Amino acid sequence: MQSRELREQLLGCVKSRKSLHVTGPPGSGKSTFVSRLAEALRVKGCRLGGFMAPEVRRGGRRVAFKIVDIASGEEGYLAVADESLAAPGGRRARHGRYLVLVDEAWRVMSHAIRNAFEHADIIIVDEIGPMELAVPGFREALTEILDSGKPLVTVFHRRLRTLDPGLYKLLERGCIVWLDERNRGPLIRLVSEIASALSNEACGNS
């Protein structure tokens, strides 16, 4: 997709008050884009809610993923490869080499989503993937957000269409953007413009 087409798609999406959903291969810059967009929205006075799931590295090796509440900073582990990182107790689910800490993850997710519903202008979810969907309650909460019409920006797993066709159909109500090395630069350069359009549409104090 050419830069002009990408710009028109994204700004048209925002102005029509549709949700924005970003996907692509690992390392394509999805989370970087959403993080920079969140920073730009905060500068414009938007109240943000939701969560991000950053990776945790030790000695250059990925050992875990966390769940971090965007608004409060509350955090917990989503999944760990090294079980010594996990507190004892709580429900767990195996996903490849990772152990999903169901109860710990849901504690942070549920607080973040509930507070976002009540207080945020824009909800951000990074990401929607197999490990997040292994947490009971998350899919239902996400569906509620999608049905609410509240402004939403997500990152989702590139195979979600196969993993959960029903959820993918809900995302298709909004705008889906495929991010890869060809359009990463143009998309990052559009962050400020997208943030301005989003804040004008969604943020009452902007």
From Swiss-Prot:
Signal peptide: none annotated. Keywords: ATP-binding, Hydrolase, Nucleotide-binding. InterPro entries: Nuc-triphosphatase_THEP1 (IPR004948), P-loop_NTPase (IPR027417). ATP binds at residues 24-31, 122-129. It comes from the Archaea. Its EC number is 3.6.1.15. It holds the Pfam family NTPase_1. GO terms for molecular function: ATP binding; ribonucleoside triphosphate phosphatase activity. Transmembrane segments: none annotated. It catalyses: a ribonucleoside 5'-triphosphate + H2O = a ribonucleoside 5'-diphosphate + phosphate + H(+). Belongs to the THEP1 NTPase family. Has nucleotide phosphatase activity towards ATP, GTP, CTP, TTP and UTP. May hydrolyze nucleoside diphosphates with lower efficiency. This is Nucleoside-triphosphatase THEP1.
